[in-house]
């Protein structure tokens, strides 16, 4: 059971917790949906990054959606997942050498999208962890 009562708003247990504030839930959902869809980076790549982050961000609900699937990785996915692993260890203090590796494969637009996705996904997973959200 979560640490607070679920609201009646939302379609998922996560949304039920955010649903205590309808506007926050709606905007959170909109941003999450936009970041997860196809953009400069594929939704498949982002799902593998999300799964990687879930293993380190403490949200049991998020972990239950699956571990990364290395057999599905292409080069960009491998680099993105590696970057997410570095982020989990050092948080925002990413060394320039790591960004240099990203710049060898990704455009500035792709790096911006990847970092935004990682930051938003981490915030979502931290919220789930703080609320004690279970699978």
Each model region followed by its residue ranges:
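Hydrophobic alpha-helical segments
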Residues: 1-135
């Amino acid at each position: 059971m979560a640490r607070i009562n679920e609201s009646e708003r939302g379609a998922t247990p996560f949304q039920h917790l955010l649903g205590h504030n309808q506007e926050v839930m709606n905007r959170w959902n909109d941003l999450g949906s936009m970041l997860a869809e196809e953009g400069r980076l594929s939704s498949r790549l982002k799902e593998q990054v999300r799964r990687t982050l879930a293993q380190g961000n403490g949200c049991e609900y998020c972990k239950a959606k699956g571990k990364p699937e290395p057999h599905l990785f292409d080069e960009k996915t491998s680099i993105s997942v590696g970057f997410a692993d570095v982020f989990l260890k050092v948080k925002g203090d990413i060394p320039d050498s790591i960004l240099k590796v990203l710049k060898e494969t990704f455009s500035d637009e792709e790096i911006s999208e990847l970092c935004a996705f990682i930051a938003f996904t981490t915030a979502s997973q931290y919220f789930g962890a703080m609320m004690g959200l279970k699978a």
